[in-house]
């Protein structure tokens, strides 16, 4: 039997989130997710797949240039960026044979990749100043068959210089449509054409003449945009939300349509929805599908950040977005607009400024004081954010953050120490909250909310804090006229409440709070977005007689040389949820579930500042009472001895002649648990 399509599965790595990690690939798995791309040619499938990974790549060609000092060396070493090194080598004039010699990758693959490069060169030869050149229709068709996106074609033709990216994409799109170059929808036929295909597994391709599916045009379908590749920060939580939305859509009598390309998800199972498009979540591809489907509406709020980012662009093309409007989503996502809105309704937030010069940064820091949170503008999701606690750290970090300029401002925010982080997950209808869940982080604010241990219902919040959070959430929901799911993160210190951010979509804690509360918040939200009247649940978070804990799973043991200190950048790769009769019981279950072992006899304490030593004292006394033998380093050892806690002093490698050495004891596995609080809390490039 012959199959008429080719499938490409590509891993997603997030090694950039770990400081000092070894990027070479080997026998230990380092990827955190994967994508699956389907096309009629290898070239089409691999280019689709490289876009799907979602790391800012547009395909095999037309990406931002990688800076590589030694191409030969880079080709020899297998890293997560290897395919883009091959692209750069081809661009630099390497032949297939040369690359084969250095990489030992089969020539068949390299020849196919070279075909893409040849087409790219042909497109470059038509480069014009600012307007769409008359390129041969055959060349345009060939590029599309090889999986080039409209953006890649626009960039190869030099349209980016004269117009913004959005205009360039639309110019190519309109030209392509006028030339009759349109994708067709093909059905995955697992029966090799021996019987009629049964599945509703669909993909789009330019190598075909007719659609395999009949479109009724009855506007009875609802399209749900999926969550894409699993990665650090967006994983199965958003898939759960998407699946709950699909189930609700089906129950309410609509045709459910899913667009997603992650083979690990439940939403890409063939029987989960009426139609599954196993294809890209890019603006171009989503528009191709929507023009064919002509749906009643599109849901962008259950798939995490990827669909959320498409809302404004889809709205500009008159796509009916269900639930909260695209303008409201933009008002919450855009820092300036959101900040202005909070000021208007009298809600407090940590002070922040987007600054364009070192003098401005120093003036602002003099006003709010250290520590401050610094975020260079050209990065996403906590990547390259840093907490700086003095002027020296700030200057060192800004050197790493590339140039501070008008084009690349740096956002500096006041960082509030010893504040609790509290999350509000809720569903609203026309600006009125109908169901909510307030959960508290066990760690102080400053650890990314995806790495924090979360407790729900909250056990240690003042009643007044909860009351204020509910009031502020109501005001924000009304102001943004929210219909659907949303999440607001708060800082609470005493009863002083500040808003960190607001996301007008389901958050990663929705599945956890839905399960603990036993109310399916996404089902409620989907009904709201479909315009179906819903009852307010009569359940309150204070009615629960148990506690839920969500704890994070880390994979540092697979990542050689990575620094395991947590900070504002998310590093966990999974999570567990446990329920217990009280906090201690639930936390113990959660810690055992993520693989921590209860220490048996020896514990090493090494605490940094005097305040930390005082904070640690009662715990040290308790451990001693339980029969643990305590080891401690320098200052900690003296402090414990002065306060009547018996301990054995151990030494750091900086005093090699003294015994016992802490590291030797760790190597010999004589210590069961280490509590190590460093003096300075800062990420790797600036840590001594």
Label the predicted regions:
Residues 99, 153-154, 682:
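Short alpha-helical "recognition helix" segments of helix-turn-helix
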Residues 274, 284-348, 363, 683:
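Conserved N-proximal alpha/beta basic substrate-recognition cap immediately N-terminal to
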Residues 678-688:
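Residue-level detector of conserved catalytic or cofactor/ligand-binding positions
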Residues 1-126, 132-139, 143-147, 166-168, ...:
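ATP-dependent carboxylate activation and anion-phosphoryl transfer catalytic cores
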Residues 324-385, 641-651:
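A conserved helix-loop-beta module that forms one wall/lid of the active-site cleft
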Residues 232-253, 614-630:
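Glycine- and acidic-residue-enriched helix-capping/strand-helix junction motifs
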Residues 270-275, 279, 639-666:
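Active-site rim loops that border cofactor/substrate pockets in soluble metabolic enzymes
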């Amino acid at each position: 039997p012959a199959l008429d399509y080719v499938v490409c599965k590509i891993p997603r790595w997030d090694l950039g989130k770990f400081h000092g990690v070894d990027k070479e690939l080997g026998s230990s798995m380092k990827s955190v997710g994967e994508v699956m791309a389907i096309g009629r040619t290898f070239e089409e499938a691999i280019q689709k797949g490289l876009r799907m990974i979602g790391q800012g790549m547009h395909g095999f060609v037309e990406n931002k240039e990688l800076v590589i000092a030694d191409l030969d060396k880079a080709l020899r070493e297998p890293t997560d960026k290897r395919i883009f090194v091959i692209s750069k080598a081809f661009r630099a004039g390497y032949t297939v044979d040369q690359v084969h010699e250095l990489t030992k990758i089969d020539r068949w693959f390299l020849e196919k990749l070279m075909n893409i490069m040849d087409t790219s060169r042909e497109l470059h030869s038509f480069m014009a100043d600012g307007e769409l050149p008359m390129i041969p229709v055959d060349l345009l068709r060939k590029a599309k068959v090889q999986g080039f996106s409209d953006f890649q074609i626009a960039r190869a033709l030099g349209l980016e210089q004269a117009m913004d990216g959005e205009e360039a994409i639309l110019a190519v799109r309109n030209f392509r449509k006028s030339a009759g170059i349109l994708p067709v929808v093909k059905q995955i036929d697992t029966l090799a054409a021996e019987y009629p295909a049964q599945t509703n597994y669909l993909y789009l391709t330019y190598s075909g003449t007719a659609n395999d599916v009949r479109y009724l045009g009855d506007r009875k379908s609802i399209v749900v945009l999926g969550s894409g590749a699993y990665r650090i920060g967006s994983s199965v939580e958003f898939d759960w939300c998407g699946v709950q939305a699909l189930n609700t859509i089906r129950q309410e009598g609509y045709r459910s349509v899913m667009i997603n390309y992650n083979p690990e998800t439940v939403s890409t199972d063939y029987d989960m929805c009426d139609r599954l498009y196993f294809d890209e979540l890019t603006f171009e591809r989503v528009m191709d599908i929507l023009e064919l489907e002509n749906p009643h509406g599109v849901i962008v709020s259950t798939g995490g950040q990827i669909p959320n980012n498409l809302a404004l662009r889809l709205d500009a093309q008159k796509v009916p977005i269900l639930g909260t409007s695209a303008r409201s989503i933009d008002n919450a996502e855009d820092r300036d607009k959101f900040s202005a809105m909070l000021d208007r309704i009298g809600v407090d937030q940590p002070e922040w400024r987007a600054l364009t010069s070192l003098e401005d940064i120093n003036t602002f820091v003099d006003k709010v004081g250290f520590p401050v949170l610094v975020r260079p503008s050209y990065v996403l999701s906590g990547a390259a954010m840093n907490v700086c606690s003095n002027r020296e750290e700030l200057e060192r970090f800004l050197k790493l953050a590339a140039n501070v300029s008008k084009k690349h401002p740096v956002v500096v925010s006041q960082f509030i120490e010893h504040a609790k982080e509290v999350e509000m997950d809720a569903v609203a209808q026309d600006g009125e909250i109908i169901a909510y869940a307030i959960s508290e982080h066990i760690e102080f604010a400053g650890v990314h909310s995806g790495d924090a241990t979360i407790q729900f219902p909250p056990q240690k919040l003042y009643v007044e804090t909860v009351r204020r959070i509910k009031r502020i959430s109501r005001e924000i929901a009304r102001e943004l006229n929210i219909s659907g799911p949303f999440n607001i993160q708060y800082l609470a210190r005493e009863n002083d409440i500040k808003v960190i951010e607001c996301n007008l979509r389901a958050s990663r804690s929705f599945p956890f709070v839905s399960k603990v509360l036993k109310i399916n918040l996404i089902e409620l939200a989907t009904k709201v977005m479909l315009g179906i009247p819903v009852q307010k649940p009569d359940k309150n978070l204070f009615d629960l007689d148990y506690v839920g804990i969500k704890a994070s799973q880390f994979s540092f043991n697979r990542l050689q040389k990575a620094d395991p200190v947590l900070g504002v950048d998310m590093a966990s790769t999974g999570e567990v949820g446990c329920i217990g009769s009280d906090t201690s019981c639930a936390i113990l279950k959660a810690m055992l579930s993520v693989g921590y072992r209860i220490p048996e006899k020896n514990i090493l304490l090494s605490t940094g500042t005097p305040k930390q030593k005082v904070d640690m004292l009662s715990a040290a006394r308790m451990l001693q009472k339980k029969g643990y033998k305590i080891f401690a380093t320098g200052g900690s050892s003296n402090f414990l001895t002065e306060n009547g806690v018996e301990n054995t002093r151990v030494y750091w490698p900086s005093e090699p002649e003294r015994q016992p050495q802490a590291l030797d004891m760790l190597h010999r596995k004589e210590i069961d648990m280490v509590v190590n609080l460093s003096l300075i809390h800062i990420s790797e490039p600036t840590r001594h």
